Amino acid sequence: MTKYSKGNKVEYHPIGGPSGTSTSTGVIQQVIKNDSGEETRYEILNDHTGKAATYKERNISRILD
């Protein structure tokens, strides 16, 4: 089971990890699970730019209402 799901609106750190960088908001478009044991990744559509990119779970700060 993953911590976040498709359709969740989230706050995330687009650069680096959870330390001191600016945050962005967006909606999770896809959850990407790897059978090889790698960390789950999330494709997030950025609210401001309208572009989608893939991020690791550690880059996501929280779910927004």
UniProtKB/Swiss-Prot annotation:
Please list where the region (Disordered) is annotated.
1-25
**What is the purpose of this protein?**
May play a role in primary metabolism.
The protein here is known as: Putative primary metabolism protein prl65
